[in-house]
Amino acid sequence: LLWKTFHFWEQLCTPEYYTDKEGQPHYKKGKTFLEDGERYLIIPSYSPENHPIGYTSTITANAAMDIAAASDVLRMIRELEERIGDERSTERLTACRELAKKLPEYQADETGGLKEWSLPQMRDNHEHRHISHLYCAWPGVETQHDVRLAESCRQAIRNRNTGNVGKDDTASHGWIHKGLVAARLKDSEGLGEILRLLVYSDIFYSSLLTDHNTDRCRGVYCTDTILGLQGII
């Protein structure tokens, strides 16, 4: 299954769509290999339900979530093949390392926060509940070995919390997702704020089942919070 997923990313990435040394996107029909400093452009790409400022479509390019998902698959294959250690493993390890070197790099905005789309033309829209671009922290594990990336993710959460006040910030799954990421980042202060917000909100019914929203504005049962809290702890 992992190797089939490798082929998905290998086939999605084509030298015809690439970024140059400055990170600018290009399309060149018939291009068959990447030059030094060039990287694949992941297109089409998707960051759930959100789009960059000035865009109307959620279909974009170089979504950080896709970069992280591809990186995570390559990591799992490497760990598995290193344990197997046969002749086929050597070939697969080489293929994984080659693809990993050509994947897009994460980018940070002017605040140092991880960008949701790794292209200079795409500005993050913080008026949104999702933080799917922090896949590299959770469920991925890249931030466990990269201090700079971890801090960039912490700043990204702060940016989203500030930019989404009074917008769609009552969606419980958004806060649970932030809590899972904060816990993985060992951000005790940020996690404490999230837990207090949830526990002292109006999200719990008398049965202790939880609503979809912290203010119960829609009256919809949702297990995201009641189960997510346990996952965070």
Label each region the model flagged.
Residues 63-231:
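Active-site core of glycosidic bond-cleaving carbohydrate-active enzymes
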